[in-house]
Amino acid sequence: MIFGIIVYLFLIYILHNAYSKYKRLNENQLPGPFPIPILGNIYQLTNLPHFDLTKMSEKYGKIFRIYLADLYTVIVCDPIIARELFVDKFDNFIDRPKIPSVKHGTFYHGTVASMGDNWKNNKEIVGKAMRKTNLKHIYQLLDDQVDVLIESMRTIESSGETFDPRYYLTKFTMSAMFKYIFNEDISKDEDVHNGQLAQLMKPMQKVFKDFGTGSLFDVLEITRPLYFLYLEWFTSHYYQVINFGKMKIYKHLETYKPDVQRDLMDLLIKEYGTETDDQILSISATVSDFFLAGVDTSATSLELIVMMLINYPEYQEKAYNEIKSALSSNGGGGGGGLTQRNKVLLSDRQSTPFVVSLFKETLRYKPISPFGLPRSTTSDIILNNGQFIPKNAQILINYHALSRNEEYFENPNQFDPTRFLNSDSNPAFMPFSIGPRNCVGSNFAQDEIYIALSNMILNFKFKSIDGKPVDETQTYGLTLKPNPFKVILEKRK
């Protein structure tokens, strides 16, 4: 009897679930593959969904829809449409999807998870704080962190050991962020897996794993309430990241002076205020956003560039020769812990266009984030082409599809750093997203990557441990990481 009732209710649920999907399939809707009850189109995706969705675009067009279980999801594979959504019609695409994993931990605080007017307020506060940041302080902190990185690499090279790019580049970006936000120095001997860095790094890695793999319970409407309770009661890693930020706030307040600006934390305290728990949570969530969005992406970018330098030694030598020529023409780098004429500064960037193009081409050829962070529609909307997108639809830009679009890139499947030398802009190249809700820390990230990359190339030649090209396969997640690899460092003379 009970079993029969359960089966009956389950069948009713399947029919209702199917009807809710199929009733939307009309001539005004976006094209897309036929969804099945409960799973929608999830069954059609492999462990490399950005490839699957790029393939689907060949059949369904530049913009189409799929169902991730119950979540109506729009896939955009065209830069013109992407700009229409994220720039021209921004207010209709300002929000994040209202799913448990986005709400969990911050309750929509900070710059990443906040919605609507709350996000606009956060963006204004954070933007004001960042504009007040002393640029000389930023340049000096990056120079100092590069000195530590290069010194560590010299120690490894002289010992004959292999270099682990993921470990040391993650430590570099973590240390730079610690200095930028907290004005704290991380010892060059500190292990990423132990000590203060580990307090933040370990829960951050778990957060990335959760967001990268996703959960069916996030996109099944019937399970969302229970899944949110599960996240709140039985998972702690996001709260560990938030609480780490709170601990730093209270520590800062012990010596805080409104007229003294030591770091970004001081500026956030001044702009947000700390009178209420909500203000404290906003600051902590913003700090967490900087670490979660800025550390792994920059470290992975550098790791991928090192991989491409090994696999394309001719470009590695071209970059090295350009840097040497620039330092000679500019009278050397000067300052810092490295000797004069043997250190690249941010001011040398204009004199090293190939290095900059190499960086850009790597981000095009190997996009760091396959879809970026999702958006959600605030209301029904008709696009310029007459197609309809319903309220609460999830929007994903397929950056892999954009980067391999033959309309915008000649020979897109070929790695060619010279493609950005003649043209600084390409509408399909948007590594930091576009529009008002693009990456708030993009300038810092580009400075950080350039200064580290150029000084590594200046000081070392990178080789694979077996003389063969490094496997370029990437593992899917919130960021697309290469498979771990080691490097032989050869000191430049």
Swiss-Prot record:
GO molecular function term, any single one: heme binding
Similarity comment: Belongs to the cytochrome P450 family.
Protein's UniProt name: Probable cytochrome P450 508A2
Iron listed as a keyword: yes
Binding locations of heme: C439
Keywords: Heme, Iron, Membrane, Metal-binding, Monooxygenase, Oxidoreductase, Transmembrane, Transmembrane helix
Gene behind this protein: cyp508A2-1
Cell location: Membrane
UniProt topology in membrane: Single-pass membrane protein
EC number(s) stated in the UniProt entry for this protein: 1.14.-.-
Membrane-spanning ranges: 1-21
